[in-house]
């Protein structure tokens, strides 16, 4: 094979690997954002119910503690939202 063809194949492989890494990072961040939105909605719902009824909803608090108590999405991710 010619050197130009080999260089083109290597460039495609490298571009593919970079694309996989970038989209993996995007997917992990998307999951973090989606999880944070769930937590924010639960906190809002708990505070609204506390204002309305004078006490907090036990079911919402349990769901919130389950979401917050989850482990890391990936073991190599240290900072957690």
Curated annotation (Swiss-Prot):
One of its GO terms (molecular function) is CD4 receptor binding. One of its GO terms (biological process) is receptor catabolic process. Residues 29-81 are cytoplasmic. Ion channel activity is inhibited by hexamethylene amiloride in vitro. The modification Phosphoserine is found at residues 53, 57. One of its GO terms (cellular component) is membrane. Gene3D superfamilies: HIV-1 VPU cytoplasmic domain. Pfam families: Vpu. It is found in: Host membrane. It is a single-pass type I membrane protein. Residues 1-7 are extracellular. Phosphorylated by host CK2. This phosphorylation is necessary for interaction with human BTRC and degradation of CD4. The N-terminus and transmembrane domains are required for self-oligomerization and proper virion budding, whereas the cytoplasmic domain is required for CD4 degradation. The cytoplasmic domain is composed of 2 amphipathic alpha helix that form a U-shape. Enhances virion budding by targeting host CD4 and Tetherin/BST2 to proteasome degradation. Degradation of CD4 prevents any unwanted premature interactions between viral Env and its host receptor CD4 in the endoplasmic reticulum. Degradation of antiretroviral protein Tetherin/BST2 is important for virion budding, as BST2 tethers new viral particles to the host cell membrane. Mechanistically, Vpu bridges either CD4 or BST2 to BTRC, a substrate recognition subunit of the Skp1/Cullin/F-box protein E3 ubiquitin ligase, induces their ubiquitination and subsequent proteasomal degradation. HIV-1 lineages are divided in three main groups, M (for Major), O (for Outlier), and N (for New, or Non-M, Non-O). The vast majority of strains found worldwide belong to the group M. Group O seems to be endemic to and largely confined to Cameroon and neighboring countries in West Central Africa, where these viruses represent a small minority of HIV-1 strains. The group N is represented by a limited number of isolates from Cameroonian persons. The group M is further subdivided in 9 clades or subtypes (A to D, F to H, J and K). Belongs to the HIV-1 VPU protein family. This is Protein Vpu. It comes from Human immunodeficiency virus type 1 group M subtype B (isolate MN). The lineage of its organism: Viruses, Riboviria, Pararnavirae, Artverviricota, Revtraviricetes.
